[in-house]
Amino acid sequence: MEFKYSEVVEPSTYYTEGLCEGIDVRKSKFTTLEDRGAIRAHEDWNKHIGPCGEYRGTLGPRFSFISVAVPECIPERLEVISYANEFAFLHDDVTDHVGHDTGEVENDEMMTVFLEAAHTGAIDTSNKVDIRRAGKKRIQSQLFLEMLAIDPECAKTTMKSWARFVEVGSSRQHETRFVELAKYIPYRIMDVGEMFWFGLVTFGLGLHIPDHELELCRELMANAWIAVGLQNDIWSWPKERDAATLHGKDHVVNAIWVLMQEHQTDVDGAMQICRKLIVEYVAKYLEVIEATKNDESISLDLRKYLDAMLYSISGNVVWSLECPRYNPDVSFNKTQLEWMRQGLPSLESCPVLARSPEIDSDESAVSPTADESDSTEDSLGSGSRQDSSLSTGLSLSPVHSNEGKDLQRVDTDHIFFEKAVLEAPYDYIASMPSKGVRDQFIDALNDWLRVPDVKVGKIKDAVRVLHNSSLLLDDFQDNSPLRRGKPSTHNIFGSAQTVNTATYSIIKAIGQIMEFSAGESVQEVMNSIMILFQGQAMDLFWTYNGHVPSEEEYYRMIDQKTGQLFSIATSLLLNAADNEIPRTKIQSCLHRLTRLLGRCFQIRDDYQNLVSADYTKQKGFCEDLDEGKWSLALIHMIHKQRSHMALLNVLSTGRKHGGMTLEQKQFVLDIIEEEKSLDYTRSVMMDLHVQLRAEIGRIEILLDSPNPAMRLLLELLRV
């Protein structure tokens, strides 16, 4: 491993207690950047979430955690990963000092933002909880924006890793009573942060480990993670013992307690056993390093990651022995104390907010402006459905016979069965995995509009029902075989049942909206739904008749079809917003924002259909070509190749036969590539991003309110 940003620490100046024999201690040359990141995270927690008491976390007077555990972190990435690490430490402290159920909620809220999807279930909507949840989401959004600005690919890998960590680790099994080390160790590896650390280090070092090596990575690093987990248990024993006592538990989720039970020994005896095991596992990991250092069958980045873990082992030891987190009598250094008390020196905290993407295209893109027609979402992800109080039309009241006989009550079980039949197609599509973009848009927009959580939840439910209803109809009308990797609903329940349920669900959503909105707001929603159907009609007309729309017609269709659910959500939130919000000032800006967002989303979706391997798994290879759908790339190519007889005929043949062969699709794709239509599409998307950033900036200025969550959503839509 090449060393650019760190230096070896003289061994005579620190202690390791023999727990990292054979491994140097290295320290970053840029450790003040860690100080900035950690202190900034702590300040933001206090500001946006609430007081967190005495400072504790990543910093140390001589050895701060990231500086010695990831000493080769690229300098420009050191502050942001230190911020992330401090945020994780604070979250860990919260889940350690609350009850099990509350800790699960804390973890679920963390995972929700990492996955950009809404977590279903009951949520405490008291002001205190609302502020905490909104504060965490704000911090996480800002954090991801900073990471995306530096390295989008690594940032997205990191987010996935962190979501997995919060899902399966992060104190999820603190109620489990482990009494055998062999059963405890797999849990400890996850809880100590294997996936969190993977995301942090790969981002910090700029590593890209191939997916097919991830399982190998886990196998090769197992000994290191066991060693680090046991190290942490030695130093966190007093903290975790006290937390268990505080909550009246008769066990501690810590190797020291487990060893005490398994070997019938006291704390000192368990400590000795634990230290011996650490030495053994460190030695085993050094053997792995020796065996793999020249193995070219393993990617270079994986070998770098294996090497980096060596310094995580030694750095964890020297930091733990001197840090205030585990050593209450130790203080911070002079600079750290000064920054904590007086605030950080002036420095741009988030350059992404001032940066616009550069457009570099060989061909001038037609820039889709945002002042044409009204704007719906066609294919945003869906969350799980929640029941509403809207009547289904099935009465539980007594029924009179024509002869005026005694009242007969409808059998309740039969009514439940009928409702289950009616809603089964909806429940099927609502159960599919979702990216949660629609809910994320609503949450981000609400950072500006500040609608109470109860009302926001109802708006999300109604928009979710409308969205899933549109998907039921779209898949049937397009004859799509797959939806998110599963058979489309009409291929499970039949076309007639699917259409019937979709129609019912649209009416149900309108009923939900009527329950919490005034008549004028309901009328706006009805108008948007009518516009949505108009856009779908044009899309179907072009497909059926083989008519090639112009780019302007294509943009208008997107505004009518894909922008409308964004528009509906915006309208409902704006009408429910506090009277202090200057509606007249921001309404036109929000109108442009939703239209641009709809265009960005639809053009990106059509583009991904042609090029994305993940999309192929979810929907099939170039499914839009099977359906005869028009994308911007295809429209651009056709208008450049109006006399290409083979191309025109293969498209006509595909429509006639209800789909194309693999070879026919590849033929069309080759022409799209030759005509640089994919490059053109990318340039249009880049221009849309510029316009969206400008629109977000205008609204931020009008409301005097930065919105990192909205900017994060925009970054996640970048190709």
From Swiss-Prot:
Binding-site list for Mg(2+) 1: D92, D96
Biased segments, Polar residues type: 378-400
Homology family: In the N-terminal section; belongs to the terpene synthase family.
Binding, isopentenyl diphosphate: K435, R438, H467, R484
Region (Geranylgeranyl diphosphate synthase) location: 335-719
Gene Ontology MF terms: geranylgeranyl diphosphate synthase activity; lyase activity; metal ion binding
EC number: 4.2.3.43, 2.5.1.29
Residues that bind Mg(2+) 2: D92, D96
Protein name per Swiss-Prot or TrEMBL: Fusicoccadiene synthase
Alphabetical keyword list: Isoprene biosynthesis, Lyase, Magnesium, Metal-binding, Multifunctional enzyme, Transferase
Chain sites annotated for binding Mg(2+) 3: D474, D478
Keyword Metal-binding: yes
Any GO BP annotation: alcohol biosynthetic process
Pathway connected to this protein: Mycotoxin biosynthesis
Binding-site list for dimethylallyl diphosphate: R483, K561, T562, Q602, N609, K619, K629
Highest taxon in the source lineage: Eukaryota
Function: Multifunctional diterpene synthase; part of the 2 gene clusters that mediate the biosynthesis of fusicoccins, diterpene glucosides that display phytohormone-like activity and function as potent activators of plasma membrane H(+)-ATPases in plants by modifying 14-3-3 proteins and cause the plant disease constriction canker.
UniProt xrefs under SUPFAM superfamilies: Terpenoid synthases
Binding site for Mg(2+) 4: D474, D478
Assembly with partners or alone: Hexamer.
Gene of this entry: PaFS
